[in-house]
Amino acid sequence: MRVSGVVSGGVRVSARRLALVTAPRTGEAFESWVDRMARVNRCPPAEVATMMGLGLRGASADVRPPLFGVRSDDVVRRSVFAATGVSDERVDAMHLSVFEGGPLSVSAVLAAGRARRPSEGREWAAVHGSRACPCCLLVSGGVWQLWWKLSCAAVCPEHRVVLLDRCPSCGWVLRWGGERPRVVPAQWVRPPTCCANSVRGRPCSQWLPAVRVSRADGGTVEAQRRWLDVACGRVRPGLGGVEVAAGEWFAALRACVILLRLGLPRVLGRLPDVPGWCARVLLEERVERGAHGGRFGWGPASARAAASFLTVVMPL
């Protein structure tokens, strides 16, 4: 069975029925699902994406299309259904657009992609790249959660550990692609539990469940849980005892993060019960963001920074 797919580089590609299909998991990122499909079909993820009728190239070979993993459309849904039998609702649930109107503005992320600007800081989400919980990867067999791509993803509420930002072996941001960033690898199968970033033409072999990560502070875990409840629409947020829309609540959170950055270090002495580790991380992050003009409004630079902001700002 074939169905007309996404236009890529002026060429319309067609979806083909895949021999083996694995079902998406709850909360899984679209890219993660493509990786797992590639593994069971024993071919590179880019080949699976092509068979699913997805266009992976942007305006040129080194430009990644801004839509992939951010938002699906009718063409993508039809192509994916023809190739896998997965429903429109499940396809939509694997895209960052599920966070629209809350922690994310999809239109802003897409605009950043078209302008070739990094979105991981400016728009508070990483389109290409992700944080991860090594414990979750081990238990799930390599399912990467969609919310790990958000800049305020700090700790795993289930395993109570700080999320991993970078591979300790190659040093690259997880799932970024390494020296030759692409949407998904075109030359090798990317094991879902391994780094597999490109390093000198070969995939990094670091097995991520073996990486040691820090235990998370109890208060930070609770702050992350509350943040996730709002981000996923499970609770109605409030400000000053008044219920507000999720977009307003996240706008207030962003404003608090920016004001906290601008007020460092003096503001720390005026806030009650700030843990010492939070103060150290916040000061380090301020130096990193302040080293480049205009980045004070960007999202937390690391999982540890996100943990610090959640710990300090959420009680406010």
Name each model-derived stretch.
Residues 1-316:
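Basic, alpha-helical nucleic-acid-binding regions used in initiation and control of genome expression
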